[in-house]
């Protein structure tokens, strides 16, 4: 019998937050590069590409961490670690996902290919960075930002000032929310020697997260003013600021379950800012 449930959990399809956090910045870029009206074809290519590559990243991560995950309370029952999915099955799934992603890539301009290659290489590298790099979230930030230049190029746009601002916003956002995520496993990571910004930032973790959130949310203002955005953008911007404030409140006591909740709340921030960008460009 094919273990479909285990496959779903291996690909994290039962936990779509990772897909959403990869999709929202790509959607922001598509809307910016197309003045609020991206084509259906582009939307479908990038949406499916997001699902395929996020799932591929999860498989790569679980293959690399299969001997580590059993020592972490939150990950010890992942399908590969628990033996529900074999290593060969995981590699087959990974091959299928990468082939599906390649088929989508063939529909995009050749310059997108270069960023896609960088994305795949970084995706393979990231799990191992947690073993030797004090801030592996920097690598994750690059991996989760590759959809932005690809969206601009696929839309026939240069990597202009909008791209630079959006890349900085997303890169900072990823470091902030993934540090919240890493705070969840900090005790286990310290025991087994896995590195993260939650450990590297030490007692300054909350302060650095707050500064990153202030920085990236301020950049949205810079972009909006440059675009002469209407009042409804600023209304949604204030709503999103409230979400960030709530996240900071959640992580204040550094309680693992609350830190994980703060990470999950990032999805709402991405959604609100997607609406804000869309309305600003109408």
UniProtKB/Swiss-Prot annotation:
What is the name attached to this protein's record? Answer: 4-hydroxybenzoate octaprenyltransferase
- Report membrane topology: Multi-pass membrane protein
**Cellular component GO terms, alphabetical:** plasma membrane
Q: Which GO terms describe its biological process?
A: ubiquinone biosynthetic process
Q: Which family, according to UniProt?
A: Belongs to the UbiA prenyltransferase family.
Q: Which HAMAP family match?
A: UbiA
Cofactor(s) in the UniProt record? Mg(2+)
Q: What is its main location?
A: membrane
């Amino acid at each position: 019998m094919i273990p479909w449930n285990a496959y779903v959990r291996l690909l994290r399809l039962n936990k779509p937050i990772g897909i959403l956090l990869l999709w929202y910045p790509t959607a922001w870029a598509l809307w910016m590069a197309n003045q609020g009206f991206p084509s259906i074809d582009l939307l479908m290519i990038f949406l499916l590409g997001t699902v395929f590559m996020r799932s591929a990243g999860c498989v790569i991560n679980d293959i690399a961490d299969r001997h580590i995950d059993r020592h972490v309370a939150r990950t010890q029952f992942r399908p590969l670690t628990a033996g529900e999915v074999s290593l060969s099955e995981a590699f087959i799934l990974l091959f299928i996902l990468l082939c599906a992603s390649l088929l989508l890539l063939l529909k995009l301009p050749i310059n997108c290919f270069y960023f896609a290659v960088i994305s795949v290489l970084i995706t393979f590298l990231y799990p191992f960075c947690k073993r030797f790099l004090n801030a592996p979230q920097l690598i994750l930030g690059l991996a989760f930002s590759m959809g932005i230049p690809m969206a601009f190029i696929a839309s026939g746009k240069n990597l202009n000032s909008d791209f630079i601002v959006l890349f900085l916003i997303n890169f900072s956002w990823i470091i902030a929310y993934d540090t919240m995520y890493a705070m969840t496993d900090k005790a286990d990571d310290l025991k087994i020697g896995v590195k993260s910004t939650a450990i590297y930032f030490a007692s300054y973790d909350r302060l650095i997260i707050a500064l990153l959130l202030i920085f990236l949310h301020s950049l949205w203002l810079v972009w909006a003013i440059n675009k002469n955005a209407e009042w409804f953008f600023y209304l949604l911007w204030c709503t999103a600021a409230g979400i960030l404030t709530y996240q900071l409140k959640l992580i204040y006591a550094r309680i693992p379950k609350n830190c994980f909740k703060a990470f999950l709340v990032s999805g709402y921030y991405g959604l609100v800012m997607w609406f804000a960008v869309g309305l600003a460009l109408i």
